[in-house]
Structures are given as C-alpha cells and as structure tokens.
C-alpha cells in the first residue's frame, strides 16, 4: 500500500477533475506510438500506423487511448488499493499480450507531457506534477506486478 499525503490526494483528485480523458488519452497513446515506434508491434490490429499523421487520425488509437484513461480513473477512485485494482490487467498484459512492462512507463511519460501541455504551468505546477508522477509510478508498478 502506498502512503499518500493529504496534499498528494488533493492534487491527484483535483488534477484528475480537470483532465479530459477523451482528449488526453488519444493524444498520449498517439505520442507513445510516434515517439517510441517499437511499441507499435502491440497494436498490429489497429490498421495504418505508418506515419505520425496516420497515427494521430487513427480511430482505433483514439479509442484505446480513451480506454487507458478510463482505466486510470479506476486508480484515482481506488488510491488505497491500486495494486489490486490492476491485478487482472497486469496478468492480461503479461501473460496474454506479452507487453514489455517498460512500455507502461513510457506511456505514463506521454500522459504527463500531454496533461502538462494542455493544462499549463498554473495548473500543472511542480507540486501537482510530483503527486501525479508518483500516482502514475504506482500504476506502472501495479501493471508490472505480474512480471516479477
């Protein structure tokens, strides 16, 4: 279990309320696929991923990006039990999909970049970033749990 301070909880929940998951999700996943093209191998059923423009306009990428962000909403709602919240997803990504667990960290980085770009430094200040990155690190750890 993670020890969250009241300030961290407040920052995470407050920030989450300002995030448009249907906007950030597609942007973040598209950014991952563009910046880290080797991750595309896990999305072979998504159709055309040949160029940045194709990725940005790909409806399957957008849909899965939204799914990822809605999954993060579950973690925000279960801050005290993120590990168990993601137990089944960890098994699926490890045993069925064979996703390199480092890809979760790469996607978390892309989510952070997209949130920061959208909300700006007045909202996404250093304290908020610290709490949000801690939150994402806990999620990444929970998703990678099955790999250990």
From Swiss-Prot:
It comes from Oncorhynchus nerka (Sockeye salmon). Residues 3-148 form the Globin domain. Belongs to the globin family. GO terms for biological process: hydrogen peroxide catabolic process. GO terms for molecular function: haptoglobin binding; heme binding; metal ion binding; organic acid binding; oxygen binding; oxygen carrier activity; peroxidase activity. The gene is hbb. Disulfide bonds: none annotated. Red blood cells. Heterotetramer of two alpha chains and two beta chains. InterPro entries: Globin, Globin-like_sf, Globin/Proto, Hemoglobin_b, Hemoglobin_oxygen_transport. This is Hemoglobin subunit beta.
């Amino acid at each position: 279990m993670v020890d969250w301070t009241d300030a961290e909880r407040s920052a995470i929940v407050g920030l989450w309320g300002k995030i448009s998951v249907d906007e950030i999700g597609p942007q973040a996943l598209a950014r991952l696929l563009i910046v880290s093209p080797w991750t595309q191998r896990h999305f072979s059923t998504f159709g055309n991923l040949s160029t940045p423009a194709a990725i940005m306009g790909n409806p399957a990428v957008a849909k899965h990006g939204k799914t990822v962000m809605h999954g993060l909403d579950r973690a925000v709602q279960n801050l005290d039990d993120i590990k168990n919240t993601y137990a089944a997803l960890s098994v699926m990504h490890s045993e069925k999909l064979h996703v390199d667990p480092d890809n979760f960290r790469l996607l978390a980085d892309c989510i952070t970049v997209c949130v920061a770009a959208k909300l700006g430094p007045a909202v996404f200040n250093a304290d908020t970033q610290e709490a949000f990155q801690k939150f994402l690190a806990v999620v990444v750890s929970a998703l990678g749990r099955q790999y250990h």
